[in-house]
Curated annotation (Swiss-Prot):
One of its GO terms (biological process) is translation. Belongs to the bacterial ribosomal protein bL17 family. InterPro entries: Ribosomal_bL17, Ribosomal_bL17_CS, Ribosomal_bL17_sf. GO terms for molecular function: structural constituent of ribosome. Keywords: Ribonucleoprotein, Ribosomal protein. GO terms for cellular component: cytosolic large ribosomal subunit. This is Large ribosomal subunit protein bL17. Part of the 50S ribosomal subunit. Contacts protein L32. The gene is rplQ. Disulfide bonds: none annotated.
Length: 125
């Protein structure tokens, strides 16, 4: 029985999976838009959205929790100075997962993951 077994293994050990989602979350917070496989994108929501919720309340304890989960001081700084205030009035749903076709090499379903209210660069050049 699989009662209370949540999460997807994605063919990786637990330490590899933890490191992979830590890196994906760091990339997402740095660039605000990343492209990855669809199963990874769906599972990334479970990692990234609680971090943004944590960043809405800027305390030392919350910063330490965020650092423990991301291991990146620059990411923690951006979470608490930019992203936390940006989503102060939004109750969840900070990420958008958009399907992006299939990868050429192995036909894996791909997806874009983006932050919902990100600033889009619309340069006329």
């Amino acid at each position: 029985m699989r009662h209370r077994n949540s999460g997807v293994k994605l063919g990786r050990t637990s330490s590899h999976r933890k490191a992979m989602f830590e890196n994906l979350a760091n990339s997402l917070f740095e660039h605000e838009l990343i492209k990855t496989t669809l199963p990874k994108a769906k599972e990334l929501r479970r990692v990234a959205e609680p971090l943004i919720t944590l960043a809405k309340n800027d305390t030392v304890a919350n910063r330490r929790l965020a650092f423990a989960r991301t291991r990146n001081a620059a990411t923690v700084g951006k979470l608490f100075t930019v992203l936390g205030p940006r989503y102060k009035e939004r109750n969840g749903g900070y990420l958008r997962v958009l399907k992006a076709g299939f990868r050429a090499g192995d036909a894996a379903p791909m997806a874009y993951v983006e932050l919902v209210d990100r600033e889009v660069n619309t340069s006329a050049e």
